[in-house]
From Swiss-Prot:
Keywords from the UniProt entry: Amidation, Neuropeptide, Secreted
Residue positions, PTM Methionine amide: 16
UniProt subcellular location: Secreted
GO biological process, one term: neuropeptide signaling pathway
The family this protein is said to belong to: Belongs to the tachykinin family.
Species of provenance: Torpedo marmorata
InterPro entries: Tachy_Neuro_lke_CS
Record's function text: Tachykinins are active peptides which excite neurons, evoke behavioral responses, are potent vasodilators and secretagogues, and contract (directly or indirectly) many smooth muscles.
One GO cellular component term: extracellular region
PROSITE patterns attached to this UniProt entry: TACHYKININ
Name of protein: Des[Ser(1)Pro(2)] scyliorhinin-2
C-alpha cells in the first residue's frame, strides 16, 4: 500500500 493514501478504492483513484 502507498503511505501517501489510505488502503481502499479512494487510494487507487487518487493515483490515477
Amino acid at each position: 500500500s502507498n503511505s501517501k493514501c489510505p488502503d481502499g478504492p479512494d487510494c487507487f483513484v487518487g493515483l490515477m
